[in-house]
Structures are given as C-alpha cells and as structure tokens.
C-alpha cells in the first residue's frame, strides 16, 4: 500500500473512531491490526424495517485507494435481505464501482448503505440472487453491475 493510501486510511480511521456517526460501530480489533481490511457495524435506524438490527460491513482496500474504490460487502452470520444486497453479502451500489470518486470516504460509503437500508420498503434479496451467488466472483469489485433501480 502506498504512503498516500496509508495516510488517508489512518486519517479516515481516526475520524471514524473519534466521531462515528449514529448507526456506525467501528470494530477496533479488525482495524487496529491491518489498515488493508476493516469491519464496521451498521445499525438499522429506528422507524425502518431494519430498526436495531446490526450488520457487519467489511472494507478491503487495494494499493490504489482512494483512486480505486474499496471492496465492500456484508459479512458474518446476518446479511440483510434487501433488493440491492445479495445473500453472499455483495452490494449493488453505484458509488462502489462506476460512480466512485476519491472524494468519497469509508464514512460516506457507510452512510450511503445506511440510507439504502433505511429507504427499503421490503426485506428481500434481488430477484436474480440465486443465479448471481452461484456464478459471481468472490470479489464484488469484479462484478459488472447494471444499475437499473434506484428507488430502494
């Protein structure tokens, strides 16, 4: 990892640890050992379908971060059922691929995912979940997403 990427990640991590927005939980054990991979908990907002539920996001940073997006996916025993989240934890969200810009941060990605969860009207995986999970790469960054529905 480049020095610039390391400095950027250290700055983002320090900010998250000191000023984590409501609904985000920084897993100190995962982030302190290795800057290349972080785990951050997201807590469903009150008044939403996911109220009080806790889900774990895993961020994996490549050597070109922040010029290339991190690999972001849900991990652990509980993957949220959502029309843009596959049962293997992969997330169909444009800012994780085509719309990524170095101005985005781990915090902004987490808040976008929380917003996506909060606006959902039903708990169900995408209609192509079974096929996708059977045939996809383990790395969600290698998926060529087709963004066709931004209403959830």
From Swiss-Prot:
GO terms of biological process kind: proteasome-mediated ubiquitin-dependent protein catabolic process; protein polyubiquitination; protein ubiquitination
Known pathway: Protein modification; protein ubiquitination
Classification via Gene3D superfamilies: Ubiquitin Conjugating Enzyme (3.10.110.10)
Crosslink feature (Peptide (Met-Gly) (interchain with G-Cter in ubiquitin)) location: 1
Keywords from the named record: Ligase, Transferase, Ubl conjugation, Ubl conjugation pathway
GO terms of molecular function: ligase activity; ubiquitin conjugating enzyme activity
Domain UBC core per the UniProt entry, residue ranges: 4-152
Function: Accepts ubiquitin from the E1 complex and catalyzes its covalent attachment to other proteins. Together with ubc-18, required for the ubiquitination of membranous organelles, and the removal of paternal mitochondria from early embryos.
PANTHER family: UBIQUITIN-CONJUGATING ENZYME E2
Stated family: Belongs to the ubiquitin-conjugating enzyme family.
Protein name per Swiss-Prot or TrEMBL: Ubiquitin-conjugating enzyme E2 W
Record organism: Caenorhabditis elegans
Gene: ubc-16
